[in-house]
């Protein structure tokens, strides 16, 4: 089972992206492919889920680990498959999705393709109160911690995400990000160690 792919995004289509990893092109279905247009021809880390059914093996991709986590939660719901879960995430308002589930708002859920009243109620029944471990700050389309890091090393991006996973707030991480951009790190660990030094100084 794959956790993520690191490679160059070589193609963006209306339904999927292609990630070239060491000369092998992986077709990855994503919720909103056009979010990846700015990353085309650049090396990126794409979190993935591999779905195997009958004679079909498909990869589904996500911008960050929290989006993938929410996808997996949706798969736990009876009647929700990978394509339905991806269609729900394509709405790009995952904070609203979580709020709707926790507030019994089945009307909000029925606006998604293929989600009727019965399935909406099932989503609420299965997931209400069970999404606290999903980091909603990373699910609002505000990838990379709302920081302008498009010109930075992918190692820097990963280190900032790791600092958030360690429990540091978005404000704390943002405070040191500019200093880290000037640091000549050679790996994610390099940036992570330097980030921890800055946070503890």
Curated annotation (Swiss-Prot):
The keyword DNA repair applies. Residues 1-63 are annotated as: Domain I. Disulfide bonds: none annotated. It is found in: Cytoplasm. CDD domains: UBA_RuvA_C. It holds the Pfam family HHH_5. GO terms for molecular function: ATP binding; four-way junction DNA binding; four-way junction helicase activity. InterPro entries: DNA_helicase_Holl-junc_RuvA_I, Hlx-hairpin-Hlx_DNA-bd_motif, NA-bd_OB-fold, RuvA, RuvA_2-like, RuvA_C, RuvA_C_sf. Residues 151-201 are annotated as: Domain III. Residues 143-150 are annotated as: Flexible linker. One of its GO terms (cellular component) is Holliday junction helicase complex. Keywords: Cytoplasm, DNA damage, DNA recombination, DNA repair, DNA-binding. GO terms for biological process: DNA recombination; DNA repair. Residues 64-142 are annotated as: Domain II. Homotetramer. Forms an RuvA(8)-RuvB(12)-Holliday junction (HJ) complex. HJ DNA is sandwiched between 2 RuvA tetramers; dsDNA enters through RuvA and exits via RuvB. An RuvB hexamer assembles on each DNA strand where it exits the tetramer. Each RuvB hexamer is contacted by two RuvA subunits (via domain III) on 2 adjacent RuvB subunits; this complex drives branch migration. In the full resolvosome a probable DNA-RuvA(4)-RuvB(12)-RuvC(2) complex forms which resolves the HJ. NCBIfam families: ruvA. Belongs to the RuvA family. HAMAP family: DNA_HJ_migration_RuvA (MF_00031). Has three domains with a flexible linker between the domains II and III and assumes an 'L' shape. Domain III is highly mobile and contacts RuvB. The RuvA-RuvB-RuvC complex processes Holliday junction (HJ) DNA during genetic recombination and DNA repair, while the RuvA-RuvB complex plays an important role in the rescue of blocked DNA replication forks via replication fork reversal (RFR). RuvA specifically binds to HJ cruciform DNA, conferring on it an open structure. The RuvB hexamer acts as an ATP-dependent pump, pulling dsDNA into and through the RuvAB complex. HJ branch migration allows RuvC to scan DNA until it finds its consensus sequence, where it cleaves and resolves the cruciform DNA. This is Holliday junction branch migration complex subunit RuvA. The lineage of its organism: Bacteria, Bacillati, Bacillota, Bacilli, Lactobacillales.
């Amino acid at each position: 089972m794959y956790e993520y792919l690191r490679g160059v995004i070589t193609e963006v289509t209306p339904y999927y992206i292609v990630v070239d990893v060491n000369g092998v092109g992986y077709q990855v279905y994503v919720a909103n492919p056009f979010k990846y247009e700015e990353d085309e021809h650049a090396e990126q880390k794409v979190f993935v889920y591999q779905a195997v059914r009958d004679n079909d093996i498909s990869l589904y991709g996500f911008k960050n680990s929290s989006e993938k986590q929410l996808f997996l939660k949706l798969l736990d719901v009876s009647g929700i498959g990978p394509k339905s879960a991806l269609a729900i995430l394509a709405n790009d308002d995952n904070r609203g999705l979580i709020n709707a589930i926790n507030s019994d708002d089945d009307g909000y859920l029925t606006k998604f393709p293929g989600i009727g009243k019965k399935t909406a109620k099932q989503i609420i029944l299965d997931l209400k109160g069970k999404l606290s471990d999903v980091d909603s700050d990373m699910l609002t389309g505000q990838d990379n911690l709302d920081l302008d890091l498009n010109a930075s090393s992918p190692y820097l991006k990963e280190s900032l995400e790791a600092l958030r996973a360690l429990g540091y707030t978005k404000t704390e991480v943002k405070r040191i990000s500019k200093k880290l951009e000037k640091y000549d790190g050679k790996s994610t660990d390099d940036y992570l160690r330097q980030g921890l030094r800055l946070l503890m100084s």
